């Protein structure tokens, strides 16, 4: 039987939600991930250090016994985020980054940034203290086609930020296009990107051809096959700028299977297994460990995990749904099989 032992991986982009749902999301992600960068787009969002630390405590209270899982917290940037708040967050030792959500770009982003110039003082402070800048890279102009919003963001906004803040460490989150791959590859060593398992495994045909499959609907939206292939090539290249970020984002079944369904795909139930499938599809299993376990902590200047997990090439059945607080979430690959499992 084929096996693969790798250093324990981390997830550098996940949504754990809050309240009753936390028990289920934390259980899933802590099975084999050592750490996770936890997104702050709650209701209300984690816009200050105090709120982020309270959220940290709620997550830690739900980590199963025996697990060493550690959440890494993120500030939600607003037009009013101050340099002092950035310094306070950095000094806490628990907040590792601040996140740009262009107002209206994705789930719970209404409190986000309306004009980039409003956060320039905060970005100056982040550059000064060494706090990472995480970016949801899509424009929100309704006149821009949804499939072009990442490319336009890179051309019109991100390129300027990189120029204006050359010493700021930036992660372009959940990239979906060849444009993003090329930009990150050519940028300085201070620019990196996360890639999701679902963007490696699927493209827009999977979501739209032969019927609409709402559980593939996420933001940034799945793109055409040529972009999917560029993402696979980047992930499997060994380039240290690309690393694992699931963007696992649970929504209740009835919020997805609706006339106006929510954006987000749930993959925390089988994240590393899905990545193993993706890497195997391009004969690059030997590159999985660096992508999943080395590149992220190296970019964040954190130690790599010291223990290991073992993946086994053995198919298993994915349930039709998983519990999510007082409701249920339909995961990616629901009712189907995944080729790999953690031993």
UniProtKB/Swiss-Prot annotation:
**What species does this protein belong to?**
Shewanella oneidensis (strain ATCC 700550 / JCM 31522 / CIP 106686 / LMG 19005 / NCIMB 14063 / MR-1)
Name the needed cofactors: Zn(2+)
Please give the NCBIfam families that the UniProt record associates with this protein: pyrC_dimer
Protein's name in the database:
Dihydroorotase
Highest classification ranks of the organism: Bacteria, Pseudomonadati, Pseudomonadota, Gammaproteobacteria, Alteromonadales
> Any binding details for the cofactor?
Binds 2 Zn(2+) ions per subunit.
Keywords attached to this entry? Hydrolase, Metal-binding, Pyrimidine biosynthesis, Zinc
Q: List positions binding Zn(2+) 1.
A: 13, 15, 99, 247
The gene it comes from is pyrC
Q: What is its EC number?
A: 3.5.2.3
Signal peptide from the UniProt entry: none
| Known catalytic reactions | (S)-dihydroorotate + H2O = N-carbamoyl-L-aspartate + H(+)
Write out the pathway annotation from the protein's UniProt entry: Pyrimidine metabolism; UMP biosynthesis via de novo pathway; (S)-dihydroorotate from bicarbonate: step 3/3
């Amino acid at each position: 039987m084929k096996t693969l032992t790798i250093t324990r991986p981390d997830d550098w982009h996940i949504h754990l939600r809050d309240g009753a749902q936390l028990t289920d999301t934390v259980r899933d992600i802590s099975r084999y991930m050592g750490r996770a960068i936890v997104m702050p787009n709650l209701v209300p969002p984690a816009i200050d250090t105090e709120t982020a630390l309270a959220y940290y405590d709620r997550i830690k209270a739900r980590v199963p016994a025996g697990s060493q899982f550690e959440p890494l917290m993120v500030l939600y940037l607003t037009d009013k985020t101050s340099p002092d708040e950035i310094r306070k967050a950095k000094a806490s030792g628990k907040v590792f980054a601040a996140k740009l959500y262009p107002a209206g770009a994705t789930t719970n982003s209404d409190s986000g940034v309306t004009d980039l110039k409003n956060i320039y003082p905060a970005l100056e402070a982040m550059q000064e203290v060494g706090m990472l800048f995480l970016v949801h890279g899509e424009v929100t102009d309704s006149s821009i086609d949804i499939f072009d919003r990442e490319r336009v963001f890179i051309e019109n906004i991100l390129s300027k930020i990189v120029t204006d803040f050359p010493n700021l460490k930036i992660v372009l989150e959940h990239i979906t296009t060849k444009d993003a791959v090329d930009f990150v590859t050519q940028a300085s060593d201070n620019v990196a990107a996360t890639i999701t398992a679902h963007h490696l495994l699927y493209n827009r045909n999977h979501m739209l051809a032969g019927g609409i499959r709402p559980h593939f609907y996420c933001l940034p939206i799945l793109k055409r096959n040529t972009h999917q292939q560029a993402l696979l090539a980047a992930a499997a290249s060994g380039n240290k700028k690309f690393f694992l970020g699931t963007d696992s984002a649970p929504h209740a079944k009835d919020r997805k299977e609706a006339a106006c369904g929510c954006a987000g795909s749930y993959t925390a139930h089988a994240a590393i297994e899905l990545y193993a499938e993706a890497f195997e599809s391009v004969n690059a299993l030997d590159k999985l460990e660096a992508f999943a376990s080395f590149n992220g902590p190296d970019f964040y200047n954190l130690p790599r995990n010291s223990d290991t997990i073992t993946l086994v090439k053995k198919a298993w059945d994915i349930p039709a749904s998983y519990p999510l607080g007082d409701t249920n979430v339909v995961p990616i690959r629901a009712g189907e099989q995944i080729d790999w499992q953690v031993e």
